[in-house]
From Swiss-Prot:
Belongs to the UPF0342 family. It comes from Lacticaseibacillus paracasei (strain ATCC 334 / BCRC 17002 / CCUG 31169 / CIP 107868 / KCTC 3260 / NRRL B-441) (Lactobacillus paracasei). This is UPF0342 protein LSEI_1724. It comes from the Bacteria. Pfam families: Com_YlbF.
Length: 114
């Protein structure tokens, strides 16, 4: 019987060698060189984290919180290193979605009676 955890750890190592991952890492490294862009990125991540925490606790967001996050997102859209990072995230996300479909297929097969 295969040890799925060993397989998962190998997959994690293999992901690091993909072009999608390497492109993301390079884009992030370039973003960090732009102190203004990186600062906005960190602010956005922090606000996003805070809102996720509120959501998990069943709390509603204030209009000001939503507006603040949207304004920060709008600022970020105009910054090339952030746009580049987002594009590379999208490429990696597509690969991860495909991998998730493959990994989930046995469960789907059970429910479809295969």
């Amino acid at each position: 019987m295969a040890n799925v955890y060993d397989t998962a750890n190998q997959m994690a190592a293999d992901i690091k060698t993909t072009q999608e991952f390497q492109d993301l890492k390079k884009a992030f490294d370039l973003l960090k060189l732009d102190t203004v862009a990186y600062g906005l990125f960190q602010q956005f991540q922090q606000k996003q984290y805070e809102m996720q925490q509120k959501s998990m606790q069943g709390q509603d967001f204030t209009d000001d919180e939503v507006k603040s996050l949207q304004e920060l997102g709008d600022k970020m859209r105009g910054i090339q290193p952030i746009q580049n990072l987002m594009a590379k995230e999208q490429g990696l996300s597509q690969m991860m979605d495909e991998l998730n479909k493959i990994i989930s297929q046995p469960i789907i097969d059970v429910y479809q009676g295969k």
